[in-house]
């Protein structure tokens, strides 16, 4: 009987440790940010993120194919016309990072930018 009690106690402790590690020590669920891309802008065109917090950017094109490249954060998306694409990443440095449309979308293509502010 004592042996069964010790085994149950040991298993309970292992389960508790596993549960604690997965909820406390693991990363938080990613924050989802929805963007809209249309000639020749992103909406919103500025986003503030926290360093070390995982993010999912979901970008929907309202018209033609677009892209989103943020070189410093290793984001490079191709968004089909009237479609959606997403990128998951965790910012590992602070600063202001400019993303640009990486798929030619018309005469205003060069001005299609978004700024991600990453703070502590």
PLM-predicted stretches and their roles:
Residues 1-9:
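Bacterial N-terminal signal peptides that target proteins for export
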Residues 8-18:
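Bacterial N-terminal signal peptides
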Residues 20-22, 79-120:
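Extracellular/periplasmic metallocenter environments
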Residues 21-29:
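Boundary of Sec targeting at the N-terminus
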Residues 28-54:
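N-terminal edge beta-strand
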Residues 30-32, 54, 65-67, 96, ...:
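Exposed beta-strand and adjacent loop surfaces of beta-rich binding modules
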Residues 37-45, 70-74, 82-86, 99-100:
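N-terminal post-signal-peptidase region of extra-cytosolic proteins
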Residues 48-83:
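N-terminal, post-signal-peptide region of Sec/Tat-exported proteins
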